[in-house]
Amino acid sequence: MSNWNLATILSSLHTDIQGRLGLARSSFAHPGVKGDASEAVWLSLLQTYLPKRYQAETAHVVDSEGKFSDQIDVVVFDRQYSPFIFDFQGQKVIPAESVYAVFEAKQTVDAALISYAQAKVASVRALSRTSLPIPHAGGVYKAKEPFPILGGILSFESEWAPALGPSMERALSDYADPGRLDLGCIAAHGHFNRKA
């Protein structure tokens, strides 16, 4: 019987993701194609490892008042209880009530791209989200408060040295709610999360 090692398994997964992001960066000259390939790596990771109740897609988010977000590279949403509003040729529109997290995916991170990601996150958090009372055999549960939507950025590299140092912290703190980035991953260097 062989000895399993969880640290080795997870390290191998990280190496695979980092390698695939590096391949996307080095193989394609066209920025749009390079970006699409990088998004596909992140989407594949989430689609493989999230519980099946959740789904990750590139999409627009819409609210009950008909307002739309910007296009979001990676939207994590509840597929079990929320149907798509619209899905045509890969262009998806997802109801705001079903969104758990949104991420901008980039080849690299710098102050301008952090600001860009913050604006994308803000475009989702600005949407109206509704909730209805839930009837049950013994009466009615009151409507639930909408849960906070996580916002983040996913990238291969960073323009800063150190990648996750003070320059990044300053860029992250330049934008308050609703564009706040809660977490992110720079595959070649590590991850960050907002301290509560």
Task: Name each region found by the language model.
Residues 1-71, 76-196:
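Intrinsically disordered, low-complexity Ser/Thr/Pro/Gly-rich regulatory segments
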